Amino acid sequence: MNTESESFDKVKTECFRFIKSQETSKEKFKGKEKMLKSFLIPSCFWISSKAKSKHPFFLGIVGGQGTGKTTKSSILEIILKKYFKLNVFKISIDDFYKTRKERLKLSKKIHPLLMTRGVPGTHDINIMLDFFKKSKSRKFKPFKLPKFNKAIDDRFKKNQWYTLKKRPDVIIFEGWCVGAKAEKNSTLKKSINSMEKSKDTKLIWRKYVNNELKSKYKKLYDQLDCLIYLKAQSFSLLQKWRLIQEKKLWLKNKSKKTKNKIMTKEDVLSFMQTYQRVTQNMFKFAPKYASIIFNLNSDHQIKSAIYKK
């Protein structure tokens, strides 16, 4: 019989190696053994039991900026592959951002704020829907998926895109707004930050984003079989984590070609205001519909887990 302690012994080396690759000299990952034993491995047992009846099994992972979605989803991928022997494909909703050229066109047609990547409406929803459809096809054929380079705020060239060669058992689809739902139109009237107050005076931007969630994104998210929500304590904490994240990106991209695309502290805080409305709406409602909720402390650590279905 498979046990969680047995699985820990089999995956710990690879998981710890990955965690180490994400650390910096000043920032070390805390409580990694507890995270694996108490939370991520048990969740993989839960996921694998559900995935047996449906191929592919669409696993959504959502959390605000800097909650560790990429790190935690990568560890889940390692465990599901190494211990459960499942074919897993992981991709971020960030990889589906529209190109700079497409967002520029959108910003001129609808609202200038849509030049800034992030909110629903700035992703290529048709490619995402096509990705889900092709992944489910019984006559599966290999296909390519976009890869986004945040350092240049645009897609990588096609020869650097992902290739899905075989139909996966599990697809991990992670991102800050994965599974997000639209809010009531009445709540859109009140601005929640200085950006909305000064740059979206006619509510055009927030209504557009909300309508995207209500229609196209709902069609996509309704296809998720499970949603894991990484719940932070506050939006101000997310801002702090996002600044750390940007510093890491800067360290990785010191070349002259990309340096001017890395954001300053002021840029990050301004940038995050575009995320605030959807993120705060998820604080209120995602715990009601997520399948698994990981409550995080101020150090990114999972302090508790709730399994709902």
Per-segment meaning from a language model:
Residues N2-F16, S21, E27, K37, ...:
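Conserved NTP phosphate-binding and transfer environment spanning the P-loop NTPase/kinase superfamily
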Residues S25-A51:
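N-terminal pre-Walker A segment at the start of P-loop NTPase domains
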Residues K28-K32, F89-S92, F96-D153:
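Conserved nucleotide-sensing/catalytic segment adjacent to the nucleotide-binding pocket
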Residues P56-F57, L86:
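Nucleotide donor/acceptor-binding cores
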Residues F58-G63:
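Short hydrophobic/aromatic beta-strand immediately N-terminal to the Walker A/P-loop
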Residues T70-S73:
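Walker A/P-loop
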Residues I78-F89:
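Post-Walker A helix-loop "phosphate-sensing" segment adjacent to the P-loop in P-loop NTPases
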Residues F131-K181:
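Phosphate-binding/switch loop-helix module in NTP-utilizing enzymes
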